[in-house]
Amino acid sequence: MVETGKTICSGGTAPGKKPIVVSDWEGPWVSPDHAADIARTKLPRGGELWSALSNYALYLSDVKHVESFQPGGTLGLIAPFLITYDVGERDLNEMAIQDARFIVGALDAIDFLQRTGHSFWVVSTSYHQYVWYTAQIAGISQERTRCTYFPIESLQRDVKEHDKELVREITDQVADTAVRKLDKFKREEDLPPNVREAAETLNDLFLQRLRRSSFEHVLRTVRPVGGQRKLDSLHEILRLEDRSIKEAAVIGDSITDRNMLGETKNNKGLAIAFNGNAPAVENANVAVMSYDCTVTPLLIQIFGRAGIGEIEHVTMNWSPETLKREVSIGNLDEKLFARFLEPEVAKRARAIWVTGDNMKRVIDESVKHREEVRGGVAGKLT
């Protein structure tokens, strides 16, 4: 355990080493949802299609337990529709440029972390076109990203026209299932008849008919990096860096991050849910609710200098006075604290240590912040 108020601790990072930062991208640093925006603007009934397939992806991973489907699987399920309706590389790249909107303070926070010796990695479910473009703006090299690779134009060449016709024929039928809320049930036997019918329709399409078509290669190639695949990426990065998970600051905001957040939390690393939804908050030890990213490097610096016990103390007693004390004992740089004290930051930023007792309240507050910061479809994503 860490003795609070000290810079010496038995856990945390080794002397001279800074915590390694492994973070989701959409949510903690950028506000749009690139794939959802592509679907909404480029596909007929795109918003409904996205909702339907998001619900179905969670049904496959959490109810039907299909091993090949992880949280975030929507990006694989929507791929046949994007190909059918002639969405191309140019469309994905143009939307990446349009969606390059960073949360306030994000670029400064990332720059600070990298300048002060933190190894910064992005692990995102998003398509590579978006992650590579926006990460480059933030000064993060392509090699330090792990995301969903979607070579859309090479995949398009392999798809037969009669298989595209199949997708066109069932587009309305799939979009209609959005109202069935497949993601609201925990067990197959709990599905009401109308919801079960929607599930069977989608199962027949994605687990049978498309698997027997030229789209099989598409479904096999587009493997969204979410859930267990994010955790696998975290393990890979730790091996590459020769670091322990207890030296990691892992940041996420959604169900796609629950595995890597949960394992980090269980191993006494810093697991931050930044404006997270319920699955993220449930698997984090710290929930951040903020319109500004300055709080993230602040927490990472305290964690690196004094360990997870000091983070618990600070976030259970969150206030400018508590943080000022961290400056006085050498756990926090005065300049970073001064940036936090700027009125629009301190007034609107909170960090809370997540416990069983405060879980429901924290989730409610965090989800509200999430919808306000990300807005629209992105704010409501699971």
Q: Where does each model-flagged region fall?
A:
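Alpha-helical substrate-recognition element adjacent to the catalytic core
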Residues: 2-163, 287, 291, 349, ...
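C-terminal cap/substrate-recognition subdomain and adjoining C-terminal extension
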Residues: 4-6, 104, 108, 116, ...
